[in-house]
Amino acid sequence: MRVSEVFDGLSCFSLRTLSLALRRPSELRRYISQCLRKYDELVGNGLPCRGPVTPAENLTITIPAYHAGGGMSFDELVILARVTKTLKPRTVFEVGSYNGLTTAVFELNSDPDARIVTLDLPPGTGAGQALIPGDKELVASRHVASVPRALGLSRCTQLLCDSMAFDPSPYLNSVDLGLIDGAHDVAHVQNDTLKMARMMSDHGIVFWHDYGGKGEFKPLASYLESLAKRCPLYRIPDTSLAWAPSRELKAAIWEMRN
């Protein structure tokens, strides 16, 4: 455990924290992480809060009832569904399929002719050395695209490879809605962000998941906050979602690489 994690834990100390540590120690890390994320949000640390869209009053969304844990919360799925329904993307690209829950949300809430593309490691692939411990557990427990199959959905294109080796060339300037939720170490997040920026159209939105975490997720937050110095980048209240408008993100990435 890092010294910074110890200080984070001490900053959340209370009798209830101690009680949880004694009664359900396996839940302590998640509890402290949620407390710290909410504190940062309330006092204005990190990215500013802002919603990505304002849906029309007559819009409805569809969310799968099944949720096996891990990945997105129901609140986060609702946000992605609202954005999909409002933005009406022609192409959606997701890095990090996991069980396909968010893939299903994109397919259920997009137009019938929209293209849904999702990328993940091939089944049976071992977790690489770069992955943080939490990612290694998810890689070991995942069942790629199991949710879309259970729902009878078949419109998505499943790509199977490490995102570090992925060639974005076939999708350049064509993606209207992007989600980065693959490996959460800085090397992968930076790689996925650069490639996503190349694939995005000028009128889209890019999301990142697991922003605001501490411990092993802190480098991800630091990377996004450094990127926010070059382009508008926001957090969504009560979630771990961050987002940026694609035009500004593309311009910032181009400036950084030239």
Language model: regions and residue ranges:
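Membrane-proximal basic amphipathic "stem/tether" segments
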Residues: 1-58, 254, 258
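Generic secondary-structure transition motif, activating predominantly at the C-termini of alpha-helices
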Residues: 11-14, 22, 26, 36-43, ...
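Conserved adenine-nucleotide phosphate-binding loops and their immediately adjacent elements
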Residues: 56-66
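S-adenosylmethionine/decaboxylated-SAM
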Residues: 64-71, 77-258
